């Protein structure tokens, strides 16, 4: 029997758009990509990471100056996959705004913090969680030592990224990430992961004037 959740996730809504050549149907995510909106949803892993990186590069090629909006609802996942997205966000020329909807945990919180300064947002009932990287390995003692050292190196690198984007001291970041640390949207704002908690979309000044 198929997992009902998996079945639901595969039912991507279609939207129809009128063009001068007639009607054209898009899946909802492709239509939102036209508006420069990218969704980071579910576990962060290699396949998902590759799709996000490809979308970022495509939108940069389309317009290297126009803002990209990234909506995040993720429990985190593979560190290297998350860092591929992070590095691409920093590499491309367009500013990337981030918005947490639901949760941004582990690597999800790092991507949330990595948005353009003053363009990092959270909805009021979102949950943010930060912690140090974890991993497991079995094999010869020497190999286990090598992998343990690599995890420590990753921990240091991730701490430095949080320092860069939150403005916190290295010690404060190390203390905060020692265990699973759950933050409300307001606490994430105070910690520097987001810049603002919003419950309404800001009014368009052009529409307001009209």
Swiss-Prot record:
**Enzyme class, UniProt record, top EC level:** hydrolase
Give the matching PROSITE patterns.
CLP_PROTEASE_HIS (PS00382)
Q: Where in the cell is it found?
A: Cytoplasm
Q: What Enzyme Commission number does this protein have?
A: 3.4.21.92
Give this protein's Gene Ontology molecular function annotations.
ATP-dependent peptidase activity; ATPase binding; serine-type endopeptidase activity
Q: List the disulfide bonds.
A: none
Gene Ontology CC annotations of this record: cytoplasm; endopeptidase Clp complex
Pfam families hit by this protein: CLP_protease
Q: Say which domain of life the source belongs to.
A: Bacteria
Reaction catalyzed: Hydrolysis of proteins to small peptides in the presence of ATP and magnesium. alpha-casein is the usual test substrate. In the absence of ATP, only oligopeptides shorter than five residues are hydrolyzed (such as succinyl-Leu-Tyr-|-NHMec, and Leu-Tyr-Leu-|-Tyr-Trp, in which cleavage of the -Tyr-|-Leu- and -Tyr-|-Trp bonds also occurs)
Q: Where is the active site?
A: 106, 131
GO BP term (any one): protein quality control for misfolded or incompletely synthesized proteins
Instruction: Tell me which UniProt keywords the record has, alphabetically.
Output: Cytoplasm, Hydrolase, Protease, Serine protease
**Family annotation (SUPFAM superfamilies):** ClpP/crotonase
State its role: Cleaves peptides in various proteins in a process that requires ATP hydrolysis. Has a chymotrypsin-like activity. Plays a major role in the degradation of misfolded proteins.
Q: How does it assemble?
A: Fourteen ClpP subunits assemble into 2 heptameric rings which stack back to back to give a disk-like structure with a central cavity, resembling the structure of eukaryotic proteasomes.
The record, for PANTHER family, names: ATP-DEPENDENT CLP PROTEASE PROTEOLYTIC SUBUNIT
Which family, according to the similarity comment? Answer: Belongs to the peptidase S14 family.
Q: What is this protein called?
A: ATP-dependent Clp protease proteolytic subunit
Native organism: Afipia carboxidovorans (strain ATCC 49405 / DSM 1227 / KCTC 32145 / OM5) (Oligotropha carboxidovorans)
Lineage of this protein's species?
Answer: Bacteria, Pseudomonadati, Pseudomonadota, Alphaproteobacteria, Hyphomicrobiales
Tell me what gene encodes this. clpP
């Amino acid at each position: 029997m198929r997992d009902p959740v998996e079945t639901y996730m595969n039912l991507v809504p279609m939207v129809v758009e009128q063009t001068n050549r007639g009607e054209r149907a898009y899946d909802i995510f492709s239509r939102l990509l036209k508006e420069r909106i990218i969704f980071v949803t579910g576990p962060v892993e290699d396949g998902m990471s590759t799709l996000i990186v490809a979308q970022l590069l495509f939108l940069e090629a389309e317009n290297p100056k126009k803002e990209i909006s990234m909506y995040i609802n993720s429990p985190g996942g593979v560190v290297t996959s998350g860092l591929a997205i992070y590095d691409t966000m920093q590499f491309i020329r367009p500013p990337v705004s981030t918005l947490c909807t639901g949760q941004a945990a582990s690597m999800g919180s790092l991507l949330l913090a990595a948005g353009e300064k003053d363009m990092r947002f959270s909805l009021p009932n979102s949950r943010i969680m930060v912690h140090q990287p974890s991993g497991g390995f079995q094999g010869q003692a020497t190999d286990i030592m090598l992998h343990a050292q690599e995890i420590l190196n990753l921990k240091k690198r991730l701490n430095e990224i949080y320092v860069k984007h939150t403005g916190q001291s290295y010690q404060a970041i190390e203390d905060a990430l020692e265990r699973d640390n759950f933050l409300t949207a307001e606490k994430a704002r105070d910690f520097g992961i987001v810049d603002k908690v919003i419950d309404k979309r800001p009014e368009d000044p052009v529409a307001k004037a009209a």
